[in-house]
């Protein structure tokens, strides 16, 4: 497939609430060359961890070498670290459809979910409605909240809402099926606050996280960032209590022990994210071309159509990113067989399912290798 180059669209200042970050719109060949792992493997597992770009690792190494030579203290060190936090926050806002002041830097989707649920102060008389296709990264924090958890089929969430509901907590795209739970419609039709697990949507489809109350993401998946990087978008930061304060929660350091929270969602930052990791994330966010969403949807559609001819596919048509199917043989053995052939996919334990992740970097050859490996 040939991907056409396109002119870089200039965003007028009055149209853009945050900076828009794109690459120089490279070809598919340029993009694939940025990810060395693609030279060897049909890497189809970004739903767990995305491939690392060479520039991501180089940015991390550069920061480590500065620390090695200059130490990790003094004004230059802290100024560089704080500037990197601001840079990454702004870039994430651009990628997630939010304002920088709405973005907290976290370590994972689960981290963000815990921050939200701890700050809501829910009790056993309160209900949280969720779906039956959620990841433990959301389910665990829900049960730790102390509220009653009401679980509904993924297409019946709205019907499960009652007058005791205090929060709806669902994924944007299910980690199991890849299907969209349409959280914007759920929010519009119920009017209740909503916490969205965006782990399988950020970097896969266009996201306007600022339209939700809370939106948590992991950056090592489809955004291809380093491990232990994440973000939480809080639409109205002043309305959520800071229940898990970190060093960055306070605006000033007062000798008398008083506490004034920082402005915006920065008050929810979950501690000191390593500057090398943030530098790597900043570089990773620059790799994604502006045609990433169209390409991801196209390759997922091709993958689904091909698998549907031979297997039971549980992913609905028209989804992007994940394609999940039920194999006719033992999934553990089949995933291992594929790995030995250089095709990386994921088994979903206990469900007799195999999940394929198609990103903007996925090629037709990757899909052919998958199909050949399936026999």
Task: List where the protein language model places each region.
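Intrinsically disordered and other compositionally biased segments
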Residues: 4-5, 22
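Short hydrophobic transmembrane-like helices used for membrane targeting/insertion
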Residues: 1-3, 11
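Pyridoxal 5′-phosphate
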Residues: 11-375
């Amino acid at each position: 497939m040939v991907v056409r180059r396109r002119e870089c669209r200039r965003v007028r200042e009055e149209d853009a609430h945050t900076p828009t970050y794109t690459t120089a719109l490279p070809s598919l060949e340029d993009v694939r060359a940025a990810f060395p792992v693609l030279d060897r493997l049909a890497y189809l597992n970004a739903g767990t961890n995305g491939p690392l770009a060479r520039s991501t690792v180089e940015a991390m190494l550069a920061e480590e070498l500065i620390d090695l030579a200059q130490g990790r203290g003094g004004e230059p060190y802290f100024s560089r670290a704080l500037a990197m936090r601001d840079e990454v926050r702004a870039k994430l806002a651009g990628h997630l459809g939010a304002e920088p002041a709405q973005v907290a830097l976290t370590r994972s989707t689960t981290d963000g979910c815990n921050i939200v649920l701890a700050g809501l102060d829910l009790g056993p008389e309160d209900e949280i409605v969720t779906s039956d296709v959620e990841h433990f990264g959301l389910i665990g924090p829900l049960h730790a909240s102390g509220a009653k958890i009401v679980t509904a089929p993924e297409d019946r969430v709205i019907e499960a809402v009652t007058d005791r509901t205090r929060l709806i907590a669902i994924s944007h795209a299910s980690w199991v099926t890849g299907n969209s739970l349409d959280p914007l419609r759920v929010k519009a039709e119920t009017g209740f606050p909503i916490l969205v697990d965006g782990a399988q949507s950020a970097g896969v489809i266009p996201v306007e996280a600022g339209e939700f109350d809370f939106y948590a993401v992991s950056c090592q998946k489809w955004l291809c960032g380093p491990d232990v990087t994440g973000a939480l978008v809080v639409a109205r930061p002043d309305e959520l209590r800071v229940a898990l304060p970190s060093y960055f929660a306070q605006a000033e350091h007062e000798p008398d022990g008083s506490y004034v929270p920082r402005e915006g969602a920065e008050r929810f930052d979950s501690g000191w994210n390593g500057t090398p990791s943030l530098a790597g994330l900043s570089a990773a966010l620059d790799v994604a071309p502006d045609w990433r969403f169209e390409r991801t949807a196209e390759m997922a559609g091709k993958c689904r159509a091909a698998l549907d001819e031979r297997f039971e596919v549980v992913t609905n048509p028209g989804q992007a990113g994940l394609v999940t199917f039920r194999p006719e043989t033992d999934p553990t053995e089949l995933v291992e067989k594929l790995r030995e052939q250089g095709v990386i996919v994921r088994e979903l334990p206990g469900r007799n399912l195999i999940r394929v992740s198609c990103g903007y970097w996925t090629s037709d050859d990757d899909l052919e290798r998958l199909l050949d490996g399936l026999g």
